[in-house]
Amino acid sequence: MDYQQKPPQSSDPSPSPPDRPPGIRSPETPSNNQNNDIEDIMACVTALEAALLPCLPARELQAIDRSPHPSHQIDVERHARDFMEAAKKLQLYFMGLKREDRAPSRAESLKKDIAVMEEELKTKDELIKKHMRLFQESQKLVKEQIEKHRDELEKV
């Protein structure tokens, strides 16, 4: 029997760095550092895929040599597909982490600043109301004192 190591036949080809999976796209920011990080992650996943193809069939081929069942080749293809799916999930996970780690966009930072300013405005409004109430009470006390002094002056 001649066993050549070849990638499994799959209807879903593995993504290469230029062919990103659906939903994965470069960040909107033109930062070369972020693009390089994304390319590094994609290269890592591609390396995982490339590393599996020669190794897994070699192990499985030993089992095939011992057993003449045709189902072993199907097992090799199934293991390879499972690995490819895991590599894609890993890629998506790392891409999600990268999005979380990136700096917030201008719109996000402006929304955050607006929320902070609105909270500060509420606090200052409450302080102004409190001081206005205290000022009005002080005015009332001063008027009462003035009336009291006028009454005393009229008596004299």
Curated annotation (Swiss-Prot):
Pfam families: Med28
Region (Disordered): 1-38
Coiled-coil features, chain-numbered ranges: 104-156
InterPro entries referenced in this protein's UniProt entry, alphabetically: MED28, Mediator_Med28
Subcellular localization, as worded in the UniProt entry: Nucleus
Biological processes, Gene Ontology terms: regulation of DNA-templated transcription; regulation of leaf senescence
GO CC, any one term: mediator complex
Keyword field contains Transcription regulation: yes
Keywords of the record: Coiled coil, Nucleus, Transcription, Transcription regulation
Effect of C44S: Loss of oligomerization. Loss of oligomerization and dimerization
Subunit structure: Dimers. Component of the Mediator complex. Interacts with GEBPL.
Summary of the function given for this chain in its UniProt record: Component of the Mediator complex, a coactivator involved in the regulated transcription of nearly all RNA polymerase II-dependent genes. Mediator functions as a bridge to convey information from gene-specific regulatory proteins to the basal RNA polymerase II transcription machinery. The Mediator complex, having a compact conformation in its free form, is recruited to promoters by direct interactions with regulatory proteins and serves for the assembly of a functional pre-initiation complex with RNA polymerase II and the general transcription factors.
Family: Belongs to the Mediator complex subunit 28 family.
UniProt-recorded name of the protein: Mediator of RNA polymerase II transcription subunit 28
Organism: Arabidopsis thaliana
Taxonomic lineage of the native organism: Eukaryota, Viridiplantae, Streptophyta, Embryophyta, Tracheophyta
